[in-house]
């Protein structure tokens, strides 16, 4: 199924260069979107169906590349049980098998009460987005009428999604290009670079913030008006239907500039007066098996072009994740030449096999970061990983170069405010999808936040979190099995664990965290 899906999308991308075919594809997508909205809205308990960021009626909707970011609103009674929720996820799974621009991982489900909370704090659940900008495609409008609060803009660089475009999406695309697109197609790279810059400009306070339904391609010139290098890389792509003969080299240069732009943002961002840093010890970490350490060193040593641009390379276990995998942060020298960066990207593909690569039965993922970004106390708070400051201080081991300075954890009051925003983001993404799997948003993170708010514990290791959560909050055998499913640990078999049991345990965790945040007076 996935093989044919990739072929279909690739064929659509290539043939969309013919204007009348592109028009026909968009009309077909509009009809399919109407059918998706109708089928989902007809399910019991569903009040409304929305698409958040794009719609095939927009001229910038790209058939074969653009997807529907769906949100379903359930009435509060239906959201209390698993029947309606399970019916929604099953229906969307079925639709995704016949409609190639519907992806289950893009689905969000909220209750009517949760929608009201999101409306009260626009921009918290999803960065630079608010329900007022959603497009209804099914059911009756569940949003409140009248004037609503303005989009949340203060401290937007502390949102868990702030660094997501340049740090994750763009690096995955450039270092391991998606197989479902024509390799010479530049549109995904173009769009991600724009969205990354939009976040940075919003963080600088240069934008008049409004709920973004869809960022027009034509905004690229204005976004990069002060960056002639990036403007030159993106220029003329729209007129060429986003195809380029030098696509791979141009993608690498766009990634280089995007990382540099993020570095410039953090270089200019004021450092809080109470900031502090630590330097981890140079000793070898007990958690990293020697066989893995030796192989990683050997593979990185063979990637000479990669080491040439790195000031420091550190490794640590992926936080809140089981089974254990590795995160490798490559902290760049200042002022890396474009040719050297291109050579490094080629080396990653050739020597490592891509950004994510196998290592003796597990996996490692490499991320490039500018030195000024990594050293800034707010950088780690712009990622979706709770307690990442402590995680790095505890687990980071330097593979090459001098040990980096790691920012100290934020003050407790600032961390509580971050937890409130993180809770709304996490619940919007994860709540009604207990079998959703993602390193960026998972139950283990929620469990860690609950343990911190209730007991003051700071834990990032999945095994430690499981033991602590089991001891503190789980009393029945079925709940223990559901916990293993949610944490992706133990011997959990999804087919043997009831969807209802997993959803109930996850819902109780969200309710507990919400109550704790209300008790602290930081969530209304």
What are the residue ranges of the model-derived segments?
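Generic "edge-of-domain/loop-turn" microfeature
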Residues: 56, 77-79, 114-116, 260-264, ...
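Conserved nucleotidyltransferase catalytic core and NTase-mimicking acidic/glycine-rich helix/loop elements
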Residues: 2-9, 147-298, 302, 309-312, ...
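Short, solvent-exposed secondary-structure capping/transition elements
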Residues: 79-83, 198-206, 339
């Amino acid at each position: 199924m996935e093989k044919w899906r990739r072929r279909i999308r690739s064929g659509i991308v290539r043939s969309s260069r013919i204007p009348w075919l592109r028009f026909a594809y968009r009309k077909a997508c509009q009809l399919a979107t109407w059918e998706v909205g109708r089928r989902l809205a007809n399910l019991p308990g569903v009040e409304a169906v929305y698409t958040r960021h794009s719609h095939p009626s927009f001229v910038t909707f790209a058939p074969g590349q653009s997807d529907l970011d769906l949100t379903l609103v359930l009435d509060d009674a239906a959201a209390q049980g698993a029947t309606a929720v399970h019916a929604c996820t099953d229906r969307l799974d079925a639709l995704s098998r016949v409609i190639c621009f519907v992806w289950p991982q893009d689905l969000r489900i909220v209750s009517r009460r949760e929608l009201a909370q999101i409306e009260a704090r626009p921009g918290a659940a999803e960065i630079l987005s608010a329900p007022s900008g959603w497009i209804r495609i099914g059911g009756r409008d569940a949003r409140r009428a009248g004037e609503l609060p303005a989009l949340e803009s203060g401290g937007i660089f502390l949102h868990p999604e702030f660094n997501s475009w340049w740090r994750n999406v763009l690096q995955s695309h450039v270092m391991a290009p998606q197989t479902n697109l024509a390799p010479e197609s530049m549109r995904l790279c173009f769009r991600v670079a724009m969205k990354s810059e939009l976040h940075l400009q919003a963080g600088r306070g240069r934008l008049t913030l409004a709920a973004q339904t869809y960022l027009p391609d034509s905004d690229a010139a204005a976004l990069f008006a002060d960056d002639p290098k990036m403007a030159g890389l993106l220029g003329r792509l729209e007129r060429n239907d986003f195809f380029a003969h030098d696509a791979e080299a141009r993608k690498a240069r766009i990634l280089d500039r995007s990382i540099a732009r993020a570095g410039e943002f953090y270089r200019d961002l004021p450092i809080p007066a109470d900031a502090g840093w630590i330097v981890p010890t140079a000793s070898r970490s007990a958690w990293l098996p020697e066989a893995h350490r030796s192989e990683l060193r050997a593979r990185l040593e063979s990637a000479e072009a990669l080491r040439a641009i790195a000031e420091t390379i550190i490794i640590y276990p992926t936080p809140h994740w089981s089974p254990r995998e590795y995160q490798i942060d490559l902290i760049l020298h200042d002022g890396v030449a474009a040719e050297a960066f291109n050579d490094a990207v080629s080396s990653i593909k050739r020597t490592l096999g891509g950004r994510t690569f196998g290592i003796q039965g597990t996996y490692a993922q490499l991320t490039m970061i500018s030195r000024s970004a990594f050293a800034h106390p707010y950088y780690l708070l712009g990622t979706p990983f709770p307690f990442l400051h402590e995680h790095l201080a505890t687990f980071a081991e330097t593979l090459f170069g001098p040990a980096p300075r790691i920012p100290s954890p934020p003050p407790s009051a600032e961390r509580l405010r971050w937890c409130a925003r993180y809770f709304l983001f996490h619940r919007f993404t994860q709540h009604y999808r207990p079998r959703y799997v993602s390193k960026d948003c998972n139950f283990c993170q929620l469990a860690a936040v609950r343990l911190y708010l209730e007991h003051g514990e700071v834990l990032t290791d999945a095994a430690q979190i499981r033991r602590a959560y089991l001891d503190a909050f789980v009393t029945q055998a079925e709940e223990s099995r559901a916990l293993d499913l949610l944490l992706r640990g133990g011997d959990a078999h999804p087919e043997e664990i009831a969807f209802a049991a997993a959803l109930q345990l996850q819902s109780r965790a969200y309710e507990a965290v919400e109550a704790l945040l209300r008790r602290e007076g930081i969530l209304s």
